[in-house]
Structures are given as C-alpha cells and as structure tokens.
Amino acid sequence: MTMTDPLGDMLTRIRNGASRRKSSVSTPASKLRARVLDVLQAEGYIRGYSVVDFGNGKSELSIELKYYEGSSVIREIGRVSKPGRRVYVSVKSIPQVANGLGIIILSTPKGVMADHQAREQNVGGEVLCSVF
C-alpha cells in the first residue's frame, strides 16, 4: 500500500511513541524525513536518530525520543502543510508557535530549517510542521 503523506506518518509515529513513553520509534527513511529530524535534533526535541540499512534498497530511521523529568520534551507535534492543502508563507508571515516557545519547520529553497533560521536568512517556504 502506498503512503500518501510520509512526513505526516513520521510525525504521528513520534507523537504516539512519546505518548506511550517509548525510548525510540522507527520509520521508513527518506531525505525529507532525515532533514526534518536534523532540525528536531538541533533544536533539542529528540536525542538523535540513526539510519538502519536493510541491504535490499530499503532503509529505516530509528529515532531516539527525549524526555525531561519523566515527560516528553515534545508536547505537541503536527503537520501544517498537507498533501491536499499546501501552506506557503513569505518571511514576513512566518507564524510563531506558543509565543516563540515552539518552532515551525519550513522547507525553503535553502533547505529544511526552523522558523528562526528562515527569518535570519530572509527566506520563506512551505510550512511542514509545528512543534511545541
């Protein structure tokens, strides 16, 4: 069965794993998913991730979730731009999450980055997801 929203599937796996207090979750690998995980790791929302190669052309991302005092660092994570409704913003209209406590992850011409990096580089793009 084909997956219509691979990024949304990864975010759901992270959300479900965090709610069940799992130490790690796995998801099929792709370049976009890895770039989003790079941003999540740089911003301190996950411990890290590793690529597990099965040798038959398929690989998987093993994501290590992060907890602080028994509760997940990720309180909310959700998809903004969906396959049926893409959301694009200019640099001036990049939204804030929880008055700046959370982040927006954008796909820009300069790569996948957090909202504050996009403002610094003066670039807009597609709003992939929000994390708080």
Swiss-Prot record:
It comes from the Bacteria. GO terms for biological process: translation. Keywords: Ribonucleoprotein, Ribosomal protein, RNA-binding, rRNA-binding. GO terms for molecular function: rRNA binding; structural constituent of ribosome. Pfam families: Ribosomal_S8. Belongs to the universal ribosomal protein uS8 family. One of the primary rRNA binding proteins, it binds directly to 16S rRNA central domain where it helps coordinate assembly of the platform of the 30S subunit. This is Small ribosomal subunit protein uS8.
